[in-house]
Amino acid sequence: MTLALAAIACMLSCSKDDSKEPSLNKTKITLYVDETEKLTYSGNDECTWSSDNKRVADVNNGVVTANHVGTTTIHANNLACEVIVKPRYTSFTEPYLEFGSSKSEVKSQMSGYTLKSEDNTMLTYYGKGNVDNYAYQFKYGALEMSAFYTELSCSLSLSDFLLERYLVFDSEKSSTERIYTLVSVDLKMFIQFRVGTYGCIVMYTKA
């Protein structure tokens, strides 16, 4: 009788342990680019880790590494943790980037800036802070390209700003300038960063 009761107790105990609900120690984390944080999975089953967008943040055995500015989700089996990656460099304000927008929509978004020039295919504005000018190019009435201009002295800080947000796709160098082609973390936008004696130009187009 004693052995039978002990066996039943053991079976009940094992059943209780086996039914333990899996859990993740955090469901949302915020990191700066290049920071890491360890997530802990608790459960009886083996954990498989994955990231919805490794270009934003990757995970290796629970250690999350922030790669570029953006938001993604880390999965631990069927559990999830939202990861928000924030920038360290915020010295520049990018232009309006909703490609396909009308000229009136762009004007509305740039209402806080002074219009510099306008024609059928272009809008330019005086910038603020580290940005000298903004430019918008239209094709068939729809926004096709956005750009901003800065002084050459801003090239290093602008490079840091862009590398936190975008992936380098290609680069080339001539006697007068350097040209870097980057792509957004969602692979939907190309960015061209040009540096020369004239200063710095950053141009954005739809991929």
Q: Which stretches of residues belong to each language-model region?
A:
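Bacterial N-terminal signal peptides that target proteins for export
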Residues: 1-2
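Short, solvent-exposed loop/turn segments in extracellular or other extracytoplasmic domains
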Residues: 58-63, 120, 175
